[in-house]
C-alpha cells in the first residue's frame, strides 16, 4: 500500500477539492465524491500514512499525484 505520511485532514480535503471532489457530508468523518468515486476522510490529525495512501488510491490518485495537490 502506498504511504503518504503526516497529512492533516484539512490538507487532505483541500487536495481532494483540487482533484474535483466535493464534500457530501461531515461528522466524525468527511465524505467526499467526484460523481463516480466516494472517499471517506477521518477527522483527526495526523492521518496515518497507510490510511492516507488508501484514501489516495480510492480517489484514483497515485501517491505522487496526491503529494503534488498538497
Where are these regions (language model features)?
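Polyanion-binding surface elements
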Residues: 2-19
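A short, structured beta-strand/loop element
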Residues: 18, 22-53, 57-58
